[in-house]
Amino acid sequence: MRSAIIVSALASVASAARPYLNEPDTGIDEVLGQLPVGSLPNVTDMHALHDFEWAARRYLPKVNYTYYRNGAGGEWSYRNNLEVYNRYKLRPKTMVDITNIAESMPTTILGHNFSAPFFICPCARAGYGHPDAELNLVQGAGAGKILYIPSSFSTLPIEQIAAKRAPDQILFSQVYTNDNDTANQILFDRAEKAGSKALVWAIDAPGSPSRQRAARYGVGSANAVFITNTWEVLDKFRTMTKLPFILKGIQTVEDAKLAVQHKVPAIILSNHGGRNLDGSPSSLEIALEIHREAPEIFEQIEVLADGGVRYGTDALRLLALGVKAVGIGRPMMYSNVFGVDGVKRAVEIFRNELTNDAANLGVADIKKIDTSFVDWTPNHWYS
């Protein structure tokens, strides 16, 4: 009898195992699932950012999709990036005049004007999604008047990407550095000559990550050496270029404080999309830590963030803490399978979602959103 109870209990636990989802079931399989694998639906059938992942997963060769999708280790940080937002309930405010919310969306980053507080993150190898690679991303960002940050490991050279900019379009350039300052100088000079207005230094990848999913398909990390990323190196790099450095990969309040002390103009809270160190915190958790222990940082420097953002409500939680703009990575790479039209649609989907979610939250001016719009007591959903 006792053994039967134990077996029954174990079976109950197994049947109650938590789901592991990339996207929710919104009926897309029922409506579009008859399409042959390896083909694409109409881009107008994409209604949310997660729809682009569904399309890319069915369309791309497994190796290509895996490169974009993979995370480090057991992929807990990848999953946590997606799920952390819903651990904090929103607090909608009613009887608010929100009719000017769309007009409040434009923002600045390092003094440059953009149409909305979100941007396309640096992601490597856009050529895995489409032959035109990063050209689609730069043109899609230009059409939407948002920031695009090409990766150091782009399929195409920065010169070719920059040549496709719209008039007055602003680009920043991500840089991975190494201990060869001759190579670093060439990298900085190329970005500057191509017209980049800032260097986004990836400081969270000093070693090679453990990406088992990527290794399985032969698409491991582009980084394979140990690199010296220190404040002393930052001081040296500043003598090598006129461009400002944004530090991408800040994951603790202590490092955010040091960035302020070292007069860094902006930081990006990021765990590299869960691709570098499994167990690293999400950008929302980092922003919460900063807000609780040193909220003045959000006034002292510009704080950006990326990781797991799929919905307008995700971005609103980050903006409520003081984050100035929110980065989107994988969904934009998935949208690239449709070419420039896919990127344009992804940008507009997210813009519309962010604007309408802000209105439904009772935010009259996106720049005035604050912590009162979120219940910051975690509900422990999937924690």
Q: Where do the protein language model's features map onto the residues?
A:
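An N-cap/entry alpha-helix motif that binds or orients negatively charged groups
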Residues: 18-110, 220-224, 228-229, 368-369, ...
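Glycine-centered helix-coil hinge/cap
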Residues: 61, 339-340
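Internal helix-turn-beta structural module
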Residues: 340-367
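Glycine-rich active-site/cofactor-binding loop and its immediate structural neighborhood
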Residues: 113-156
